[in-house]
Amino acid sequence: MNLNSLSEIASYIVSEGKGILAADESNPTCTKRFDSIGVESTEENRRDYRELLFRAEGMKGNIGGVILFDETIRQNAADGTSLVDVITSQGSLPGIKVDKGLQPIGDSEESLTQGLEGLDER
């Protein structure tokens, strides 16, 4: 895959027959999902769940890009392969959700998305 510009990357991700997999559930969201099926929300179980998604047969050729949660981009699969490498081996491009939620602005009803500050350190 030789994608040098933002336009080439965007075109690849949404090329014919491909979609985007939103695998960016936060840990609290993942916990709710696991609680509903009686599975403890440990880092290992979340990793196994994500690995199951990324290694699925239907991933190759159908998913152009995967949106990841902050924890996921640093995780390795059970065999030690980084989950990012698992995704790229399926022909998909990984990306990361950088926002960390909303914060109220002063006394108004408006809010601001957090997450860009401190991005380099993360």
Residue locations for each model-derived region?
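Alpha/beta catalytic barrel-like cores
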Residues: 1-122
